Design a protein with these regions (language model features):
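Short secondary-structure boundary segments
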Residues: 213, 236, 257-258
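Short, charged, intrinsically disordered terminal tails
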Residues: 258-276
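Acidic/glycine-rich phosphate/pyrophosphate-binding loops and surrounding catalytic core
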Residues: 1-204, 208, 220-225, 230-234, ...
Length: 276
């Protein structure tokens, strides 16, 4: 499903048959314009999605921006203008803002953590813990904020987690079967919870070791054991407060589901609507 189809689905969810409030008080074909205002500091992401909401309602709608995705914006700043049929402006307002606020919130939170990794080898990754039918938008927002995308979907790579390992009969057996099934160029990543599992994964030839909810001391030992043999990824309970400590340990990647499932929105609004 492409972006336009997802946006149209969101519009149908909100408008259904008609915007009865707007249609009851606004005449047809009355032109107007409204300002896009920031209500808090943050990083903007999703401007083209915001614009597309109005264009899909009426292709004649004009949307002007005074910033671009990835820019830092300030509270009270006017960052855009929407001009067109007032009915369209009112009916599309909520859907357009929902996208822009959600995407900008993810970009803002990602930027806060990514900035803590500047100057280090460690890369910040997202996960598949995304909102249904929002993955394309949420993962884009992570990239805008300075993070990197892990797997976009289940076809993108092999990641053996606890349930895969249990069903396969153990770490070594899971890696062996994955290697037999996967093309040679595909890396095999496996999640481990302790050093014994880690040693089995290395013996089996895993390419990336995900250290899941391990203690700091065990992670230090794990990184040493993996040096020159496999890349390391830290996952689980990643916060702004503990990122520096994880970087010091020397992991190659830090993955965080919180980038997409727990980022607060960036407060934005459409204000000063008037007829023209």
């Amino acid at each position: 499903m492409n972006a336009d189809e997802l946006i149209l689905q969101a519009l149908r969810e909100d408008i259904t048959s008609e915007d009865i409030t707007t249609n009851s008080v606004m005449p047809h074909d009355q032109a107007g314009e409204v300002d896009l205002i920031c209500k808090q500091d943050g990083v903007i992401a999703g401007l083209e999605v915001f614009k597309r909401v109005f264009e899909l309602l009426d292709e004649k709608t004009e949307v002007v921006f005074y910033c671009k995705d990835g820019d830092t914006v300030k509270k009270g700043e006017k960052i855009g203008l929407v001009r067109g049929d007032i009915r369209v402006l009112l009916s599309g307002e909520r859907t357009a803002l929902n996208y822009l606020q959600r995407m900008s919130g993810i970009a803002t939170y990602t930027r806060e953590i990514a900035d803590l990794l500047k100057g280090t080898k460690t890369k910040l990754l997202d996960t598949r813990k995304t909102t249904p039918n929002m993955r394309i938008f949420e993962k884009y927002s992570v990239k805008v904020g300075g993070g990197y995308n892990h797997r976009y979907n289940l076809s993108d790579g092999i990641l053996l987690k606890d349930n895969h390992i249990g069903a396969a009969g153990g770490v070594k057996e899971a890696v062996r079967m994955a290697k037999e099934y996967a093309p040679f160029v595909r890396k095999i990543e496996i999640e481990v919870e302790n050093l014994d599992m880690l040693k089995d994964a290395l013996e089996a030839g895993a390419d990336i070791i995900m250290l899941d909810n391990m203690t700091v001391e065990d992670m230090k030992k794990a990184v040493e054991l993996c040096r020159g043999k496999a890349e390391t990824e830290c996952s689980g309970n990643v916060t702004r407060e503990n990122v520096a400590r994880l970087v010091d340990i020397g992991v190659d990647y830090i993955s965080s589901g919180a980038l997409t499932h727990s980022s607060p929105i960036l407060d934005l609004s459409l204000k000063n609507l008037h007829a023209i």
